[in-house]
Design a protein with these regions (language model features):
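A glycine-rich phosphate/pyrophosphate-binding beta-strand-loop-alpha-helix module
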Residues: 93-97, 113-116
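Short glycine-rich loop/turn motifs that provide flexible caps or phosphate-binding loops at active sites
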Residues: 20, 48, 67, 73, ...
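Short Asp/Glu-rich motifs
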Residues: 104-105, 122
Length: 134
C-alpha cells in the first residue's frame, strides 16, 4: 500500500490519541495483525492526520458530525465516539440535539438506538453501598 509521509502518520497518531484516548489507540495498534496493519496506518494517516487534523471545524463540531453520521448509519463505532466526546468538550445535551436531526433525516429507529447508547454512556451510575464489592 502506498504510504503518505510519516508526518501525516505522526500528526494523525497524536490527534487520534487526543480524541479517542491514548489507551484505546494503543490497544487498537497492539491488536493489528498482518491482515489489517496497513489499514490501521491508513486510518491514522487519512482520517486522523487528514480530516480530523483540518482546522476549519473545531473538534467538538467534528465530533457532533461524526456521531450523527454513525447514529444515522447504525455503526458500532458510535459507542466509541460517545465515550470519546468527553475529550472534545462535546456535551451530551448537544449530542441529544444532533440526534433529533438524525430522527428527522435518518429515521426514528436510528435515533432511538443512538439515544439508548447516549443514555447508557452519560447516565449517572448508582453508587455502591459501603462494604459491597464490584
Amino acid at each position: 500500500m502506498p504510504r503518505m509521509d510519516d508526518s501525516a502518520f505522526e500528526r494523525g497518531l497524536a490527534v487520534r490519541k487526543e480524541v479517542l484516548g491514548a489507551e484505546h489507540v494503543e490497544r487498537a495498534t497492539a491488536r493489528a495483525t498482518d491482515l489489517d496493519r496497513d489499514f490501521q496506518r491508513w486510518i491514522t494517516e487519512t482520517a486522523w492526520g487528514g480530516v480530523w487534523a483540518r482546522t476549519r471545524l473545531d473538534r467538538r463540531t467534528k465530533h457532533l458530525v461524526t456521531i450523527a453520521i454513525l447514529a444515522a448509519l447504525g455503526r458500532d463505532e458510535l459507542e466509541l465516539h460517545l465515550r470519546a466526546s468527553r475529550n472534545t468538550g462535546t456535551a451530551p445535551e448537544d449530542i441529544a440535539e444532533a440526534l433529533m436531526h438524525v430522527a428527522v433525516y435518518a429515521g426514528v429507529p436510528a435515533a432511538n438506538a443512538a439515544f439508548a447508547k447516549l443514555k447508557a454512556e452519560f447516565s449517572p451510575q448508582p453508587e455502591k453501598a459501603p462494604g459491597t464489592s464490584a
